[in-house]
């Protein structure tokens, strides 16, 4: 055979580390879309088991927006960009946890000094020029109370939405002193490819350490467009 092409498959094993947030349906979509949009030939679903616990049925977390239990229906979505387009999903940066001797390529945890700025980049694989999400939500976790100003691709964040933390089940595994925040970003600011999030610490005296950053793309209700 003259075909020397070697297919490359992305593995989802990074989302199974015990210290990380328990993986959710929306996070799996974001992971797979990220990999496929970067040119992967497919996705290897590591430890993606359908247990007797739920028998393949949906099991949502408090708030009814998030599902953290794998089920067979997701196999119809995760292997193709076409089936992932227009579905609710979450993109996130690695927390920087080290397991099995691996060093994640991530800016987190990120320390921002008082009244200083920092930037991080989040890759989005969705073709947002043709199908734009109805709502764009940024979730971030800090090691202490924080007062941040945020911009996405130069567009300022719209408003804090504290109730989203519980609605989307983002308060899990909080350690002593850690805080979880949610803020709406302008959906028009989102683009396919790298998105620059600029972060400013508004505090005049204390540094802030950002432990987790997640970007949720909401195209519609969880019932019709998928759970987060």
Tell me the role of every PLM-derived stretch.
Residues 127-137:
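Extended extracellular/luminal ectodomain segments enriched in beta-structured repeat modules
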Residues 1-18:
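Glycoside hydrolase catalytic-domain groove-lining segments
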Residues 73-103, 111:
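Pro/Ala/Gly-rich low-complexity, hydrophilic intrinsically disordered segments
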Residues 19-85:
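Substrate-binding cleft of secreted/luminal carbohydrate-active enzymes
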Residues 11-13, 45-46, 153:
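Generic beta-strand/beta-sheet core signal
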Residues 141-225:
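Beta-strand-rich ligand-recognition modules
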Residues 112-128, 180-181:
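Short beta-strands within extracellular/lumenal beta-sheet-rich domains
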Residues 15-19, 50-54, 145-146, 158-159, ...:
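Flexible loop/turn segments at secondary-structure boundaries
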């Amino acid at each position: 055979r003259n075909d020397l092409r070697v297919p490359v498959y992305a593995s989802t094993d990074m989302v199974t580390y015990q210290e990380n947030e328990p993986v959710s349906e929306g996070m799996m979509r974001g992971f797979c879309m990220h990999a496929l949009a970067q040119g992967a030939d497919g996705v290897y679903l590591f430890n993606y088991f359908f247990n007797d616990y739920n028998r393949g049925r949906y099991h949502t977390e408090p708030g009814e927006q998030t599902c953290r239990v794998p089920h067979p229906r997701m196999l119809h979505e995760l292997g193709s960009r076409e089936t992932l387009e227009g579905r609710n999903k979450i993109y996130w940066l690695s927390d920087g946890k080290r397991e099995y001797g691996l060093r994640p390529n991530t800016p987190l945890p990120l320390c921002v000094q008082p009244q200083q700025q920092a930037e991080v980049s989040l890759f989005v694989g969705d073709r947002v020029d043709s199908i734009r999400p109805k709502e764009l939500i940024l979730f971030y976790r800090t090691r202490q109370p924080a007062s941040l100003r945020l911009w996405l691709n130069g567009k300022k964040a719209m408003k804090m939405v504290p109730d989203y933390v519980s609605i989307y089940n983002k308060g899990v595994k909080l350690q002593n002193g850690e805080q979880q925040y949610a803020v709406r970003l302008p959906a028009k600011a989102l683009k396919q490819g790298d998105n620059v999030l600029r972060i400013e610490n508004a505090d005049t005296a204390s540094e802030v350490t950002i432990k987790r950053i997640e970007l949720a793309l909401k195209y519609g209700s969880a019932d019709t467009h998928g759970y987060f």
